[in-house]
């Protein structure tokens, strides 16, 4: 659906930004790391993850692909929702979080608000083999490749 938003930063707060694209302001929930990356800028390109539920359509924005990929891995863990994943990503930069997970440091994860011992262990067990600190996985690398719409359509059809 929406891969990214590019436009003027209309409003920027530690937990959310409004990106004006074509006269429409999109409210995008962000981590503190993305907030820091956007500070002082008038325009931005924010990578997006959409969460479409029965009661809400919520956009999550990321300054880079590594953060978005980690967010998607985190929300795939049972018991970790989008809000908790955003808090985790606000607590550590991507390199540090990857190292914590790869190293099995449950104590560090438990220090994050909303993460208990069982959830910390589940994150480590579920993601340890999927994360190599400093490296993008094959799926993450493929998500960086731009495929034109006609090509994408012919691949899907």
Q: Positions of the model-derived regions?
A:
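Intrinsically disordered, low-complexity linkers and terminal tails enriched in Pro/Gly
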Residues: 133-148
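Nuclease catalytic cores that cleave nucleic-acid phosphodiester bonds
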Residues: 104
